[in-house]
């Protein structure tokens, strides 16, 4: 129930400062690479802490995506560059890729 509430809050709340950006560029590559590395690092860290494979996968993905969403929230302040759904999409793509690469290297 809490997850549904948080997702609803994020999707239904308005953002006063949106970014006017494109789908490509150096910024997007940085989001992708950083999220991939954070996801793989989160997976590896949680495995070393004794978590199961499923839990470590969830931890790594959520760790990476939550940091990406936090960065976008920081950007949405009036002095920032604005919230970018495109940046967040690249964060999710990078986190998924980082998880996949981490899984492939573990076998």
UniProtKB/Swiss-Prot annotation:
Short name of any one Pfam family annotated for the protein: DUF2279
Q: Where are the transmembrane segments?
A: none
The family database entries (PANTHER family) matched by this protein are listed as: PTHR35462, TRANSMEMBRANE PROTEIN
Q: What's the protein here called?
A: Uncharacterized protein YfiM
Species of the source: Escherichia coli (strain K12)
């Amino acid at each position: 129930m809490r997850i549904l509430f948080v997702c609803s809050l994020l999707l239904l709340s308005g953002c006063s400062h949106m970014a006017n950006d494109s789908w490509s560029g150096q910024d997007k590559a940085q989001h992708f690479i950083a999220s991939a590395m954070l996801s793989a690092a989160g997976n590896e860290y949680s495995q070393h802490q004794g978590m199961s494979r499923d839990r470590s996968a969830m931890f790594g993905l959520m760790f990476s995506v939550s940091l990406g969403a936090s960065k976008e929230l920081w950007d949405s302040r009036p002095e920032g560059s604005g919230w970018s759904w495109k940046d967040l999409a690249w964060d999710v793509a990078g986190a998924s890729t980082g998880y996949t690469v981490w899984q492939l290297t573990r076998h």
